[in-house]
């Protein structure tokens, strides 16, 4: 969803849905692996293309798993009803119908299926002149990919952080979470167990 504040975050307007899955949420969820929702959204302003891009996790029929995909809005405010989902080649799929409140199918981002996962954190890195994405795989490994345009992504690499399991990465620099330079910090959940217990950790990521 999307909402707006005109007083620096003190109060917020009622949110509106901007992206949705193909099926309504059932009263009794069918369980893992079924497509009833989207999550893990990370929204960035792509200045070169003059669009908002939302990277998120959604169930994709191909390959039958939750994958990272994306949707964009050309509206400066990113208003409800303006987002189109990725169709594998362009942004043409309806994000959320105003009447049904359902959206079109989710299509995976090519190359990122090397490691299926979610919770993307995306930042423009002006040192290397590329977009950088980190996310966790469903096997609880943190992966990193880069893109020149924010659309076509390189095959990700799995980072060896020393922990047996790591999830929920976020890129933060001295400039914030939208842009960064040669060195940025990556915060993440380390040593997460099946009960969800974990510790906060961070690593310095240096680009060359």
Spans of features found by a protein language model:
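Beta-propeller and closely related beta-sheet repeat lectin domains
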Residues: 39-42, 118-121, 165-176
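Beta-rich carbohydrate-recognition and catalytic domains
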Residues: 1-33, 47-115, 125-165, 176-208
């Amino acid at each position: 969803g999307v909402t707006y504040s005109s007083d620096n975050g003190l109060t917020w307007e009622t949110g509106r849905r901007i992206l949705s899955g193909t099926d309504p949420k059932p009263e009794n969820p069918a369980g893992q692996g079924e497509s009833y929702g989207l999550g893990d959204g990370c929204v960035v302003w792509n200045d070169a293309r003059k669009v908002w891009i939302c990277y998120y996790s959604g169930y994709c029929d191909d390959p039958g798993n939750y994958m990272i995909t994306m949707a964009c809005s050309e509206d400066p405010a990113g208003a409800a009803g303006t987002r189109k989902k990725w169709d594998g080649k362009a942004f043409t799929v309806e994000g959320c119908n105003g009447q049904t409140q359902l959206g079109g199918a989710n299509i995976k981002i090519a190359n990122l299926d090397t490691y299926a996962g979610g919770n993307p954190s995306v930042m423009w890195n002006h040192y290397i002149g590329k977009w950088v994405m980190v996310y966790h795989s469903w096997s609880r490994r943190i992966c990193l990919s880069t893109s020149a345009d924010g659309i076509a992504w390189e095959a990700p690499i799995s980072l060896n952080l020393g922990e047996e399991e790591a999830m929920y990465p976020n890129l933060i620099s001295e400039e914030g979470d939208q842009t960064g330079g040669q060195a940025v910090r990556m915060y993440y959940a380390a040593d997460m167990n099946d009960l969800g217990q974990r510790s906060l950790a961070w690593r310095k990521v240096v680009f060359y």
